[in-house]
Amino acid sequence: MKVALDLDAVLGDTRPLWEAWLEDAARRYRSIAPLDPSELSKDRGEAAEQLDRWAEGGVGDWHGSLERFTEDHAPVFLRPDPDANAALRRLQSRGDTIGAFTDAPEPLGRLALAQLGAGRRLEVAEFGAGARERVLEALGEGSVVVASRDELLALPL
């Protein structure tokens, strides 16, 4: 079986951590380049493009800031789910191919997978705009998209 997991819906929602970083970045960089998180697109792929333009105002590498914030705050926002991780272990042990996707930027998604204990179980992980399509392409035909924790736990193991 080839399984594509929606990271935010199945393993742990990264959006609250993303929103906390946006608030922190708006406060931290307000004297360099004003940022109003409420004006950013809810689609994080589009928001990343908006942040690229914002960073040109003197902020620089916002990805590095997001990575540091995520390293510091992920344990507060994201908790491993023992049942979900057990299901991933069983899938992996029987030779299934597992991928995950999120529209979150790469530093946030990658560190979230590590915090949630899922990173080492995956063959492929994709982040940002078009992540779902890239994971499905990498996994190949016949992939099953898992869109909730309940769907993961209901997979035949």
What are these regions, as identified by a protein language model?
Residues 1-82:
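N-terminal helical cap/lid subdomain that shapes the substrate entry/recognition surface
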